[in-house]
């Protein structure tokens, strides 16, 4: 058995890299032979699980797992003779707390000492507690065999508990089944649901401390527990921000599913972990080794300093105005009136003599509603002549308001000026638009009214803070409840908060209910509450807003990205959703967010590059598993499973494209690839010490068959001599390289056969490539090449019979250097992509959890985010990655969709675009609009056909007008007028709910169409085409698919795991991410979030537009079939009208296969049909006229020809392949 193990697992010593009790790798395990002291390394937990499964049964034949599966077989076969006996071995496994969980065990003599004190029955409820908690002897040990299969103990936690509580030192090894001191008992538990551990607490040493990990409820701020147990320190941890954290423990057993070591490994803000000397004999954590593979230059490389980023510089505009006196006069008058309004409301507080009443209100409220004063005054200043006031006038206005109010208070002045900055950066047009939101009621001084509002607000605050009798989370909350409880003077409330308005045209009365305007009747309580007469409104549109609107958190300002108190001066009847929340943590820095979006374009390359390394690691792991079942066991199903798994990996690697093939070469044999790049340059470049700008590298071409053969031998065979010979197939034409290689080689085999391989390199590459391409199981190659003589004799015989063939152009990797440079660039930018252990997939991973961890480690680790909680970073990243997964990591589509979704919080449809989401079933389309439904006001309508006629009730029509997004699900057909009406930006309409009066609304919704089948739009034209943004998805989220360990695998197969409750899991993350998009992706001047032009230059979107157009319009179909294109004047080409008509005749023969099935049904009676309803015939004259109209700038009426136009001029050149949506 020892000789077999030496072939499977390499020996390691007790040096620093493989020190005993040193936690340096979450996957590696070490087996020790206690007789000889030999330590053997298993590179992956899977190797140990395969080894354990193979030796679990000491009987002949199938392993224990497959014996259970085959118990119902009727056939009786003679059992094969056992190849190896496992009984009585001396193997033990060293502890690794990431993957070593066991049934509780300890030496019999130790158990006898503590059995009266060890109480484990409290962790289970059982019908038969004695059976569950029974402890039995096995050899020299005692263990608990009847625990549930999903329950275990952390071996490290078990060691610590026994040592701290009882002073028992347990060896840091676990005996393996059939160990002579244990017997046929398997102590290991893999992936337990819960496990016993010693109670621990990891908290920072800050004030107040931040808890990073707890697994129990003990208060560790106490030095000693009530039971007398002392609190011990286990680790001291240094953090990235300079703080420290301490891991404390107490000798209590707890049952949990939380692993401290996973927190220490995964939290990117923890940099160094030092174990207390007292416990180093049990555990010693090396964070660097735990997080990074050892590779050339990785350990000794100094930390890379982040690139210098130029500071953001904003020019400061000097204030000036020809109307300075007018502005100052209006400010002075306004402040007097505002103060008067406040004094009337606040008479109860004796503040009428306070000259700084308004200033006190602003300062104490944190300038919460300071902007209301700016809106009001500026609106009065500019109401007669807006064009005379520019940015300099606005800047002067802000400075004069602030100086007039806070000229004697420098701190308040600075704060007020900062509050004005968002408007100065956007420009005067945006500020004018903001002020237009503010409604000034006729018949009342707007400043006095604002003063009454301020006074009522201040009144509530003073009342709530004057006594403990009032319980309130936020004393500044201005709402119905606080206004009534604080008994604000009713007259002030009626005038400035619960404002009553009446539409004089429709006689509809509305009252502001503390959040938004509500239609009321005379017998409603809200109507009776307000005794003042209603303000008369005429021809007023409600919800006519762009930058400010009511929300359940107050009035939201898109420009400042902040909330004001509820106020009645915005005429809105609804509360749109917003992505920002008042209690959200601070945004990530703009540089971090910009880095996230900038990385989007190369994420597929990043994931593909990682996927190559993952495949190679899997090959090494499966090779060991195959060797284990071949050499140690007789289980035929296990052997077949391993062979099939290895063969699947081989086929995936064998079928890689050129780009991935070169990346694979860099991982498998980086030095050889660099040799190729150097030795295939021109002579001048090879001789030069300094890099030269030469195009020779672009001419490097490598025999693809030879390269693939080299990589397969390097990776699967791993024979150094054969590998060296195989690489000579590539370097065969470089005599200097071959001669140098023969001088330095110490292999007689290489020296003997090098000439043969270089001379016949083309034939050898072709033969081996053909054999590998046809091979049934790749492990047969691994067996065949073990006999060098036989293998080389076969090659010589095959070469002799192989006909000579000239090198084929299609058998060359023509862009070798471009692929090499691309891979090298990715690996340089993301240096930890191949060497970070944290991003390796774990058994507990879902696709979402792995992808988030990968992004945090690989992408965000390049940015300084150490001051942000990991939970918040995770939330932003999860929201971002949702859009990537939904589009199968299509950069352009995901980028547009995230901007479209973010634009919904700016309540105006400035895009004139409808987003159309066709796709296969289960591609995630429903999840997209379900997420939006949680976040914004959505009106959803399910119908397959829409014409111009209304299909909804009046209540639903009003709901649609009040919504932020209008979603039509499973729409199959619609009219051109219906589509344009809802896709356009101007959508005002007068509607009424049932039993309520008519009101005029400004509709701010954007249109979203979702379906599985292609959409048919009747009377499709250029106007319809220009209003579409199309994102097609053809991947699926399936319940039976499991995460493979690499997202790129799912990108390729277009099959993703279907995760349950995904909307609930993602809604907060998507919201937080979209809040960042709104914050940082707005246009500088307008403050709007752009989305309509983001796909203009995307070739996939242009193709999908063509596909939609061809499917809906005969004219577009003819243009596509005939490939009609405009040409530059210099081309001097033309097509006669006669030829055009002739080719249109040929095209009409294929039109029906291009057009939507509904086309003939809906157009049977129209003039485009030259036949009958039953027999549809296209009118070629009408089609010709449509072509003339489409290319009117090219058509020459006098010459009856089309100038500067190219097209198919015969039947053989026409395109009869119907385009399909693609992504």
Swiss-Prot record:
Localization (cell): Host nucleus
Residues engaged in binding ATP: 919-926
Gene Ontology MF term list: ATP binding; ATP hydrolysis activity; DNA binding; DNA helicase activity
Ranges of the DNA-binding region feature: 967-981
Gene Ontology BP term (one): DNA replication
Role, per record: Essential for the initiation of viral DNA replication, it may contribute to other functions such as controlling the switch to the late phase and leading to the inhibition of host protein synthesis. Required for late and very late gene expression.
Record-given protein name: ATP-dependent DNA helicase P143
Taxonomic source organism: Orgyia pseudotsugata multicapsid polyhedrosis virus
